[in-house]
Amino acid sequence: MTLQPYIFQDEEDRIDSITYSVQAPELPFELHEARFIYGKSKNLSIYVDESGNTGGAVNSNSLWYIICLVFFENEDISEYEDELEYKFSMLGHPDHCFHTSPLIHGENCYANDSINVRRKIMRNFMSFLRQLPAKHIEICIEKKNLTEEKIYESLIKQFIDFIENNLQYFSRYSNITFYYDNGQNIVLKILEETVKDIIPEATIEYETPKHSRLLQIADLICSLKWLGIKSRTVGLSYKEEYFFMDDRHLKRDFLRIVEKKEFKQN
């Protein structure tokens, strides 16, 4: 599935496309009556991250808002994590918490790293992504002149639609946990006001990216998806294009890998 932001054609289209109130919508009867299969031994972890913001002036860096969900069945990945830690240590970043945007722009802990070192760090983390038995899905909207309330309405509608359309998938698991770093209130609000009503087995837990490679993966995927949309519309910034060299390399070496990990919806 190729991620495409929905572009409203006019104000009437914008209004007609938003049908959920600011309060969490009342769930359809069939969702309340959904029966999940108990006694399953599998556990599902869902790691959540976002790209963009819901307020402030709209410019080329804030035209879209994306929420990424990474699905992971809690398999043993310690071998992959140990290999990644060794590679990061060899590049001068032991116990490293990967963060995509500062890496691309050479900021924060990457400020003193050369472009070659930063690209190697990215390649190592992309290799880690390829090895992971994980899938992802994104919820994306084009902000345009939407208020924060309208952004919330659109996001929560898409979130509920996704879960409703994949109830059979979620029924495979006896325990489902959503992990989020509480980075933005709008995402936390969507999780808190919908998850328990639709999936009774689910819980929401706070986690920091520093202690979770899967949250760092969610950050990577979310950022790359956002850059993919940006490259097709307004174009990459100078630093972004310098890091990836050009749009072709971004698509070939990064976005294609991400696309292979996409969650296949029912």
Question: Model-flagged regions — what are they?
Answer:
Residues 2-266:
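Phosphate-ester processing/binding pockets and catalytic centers
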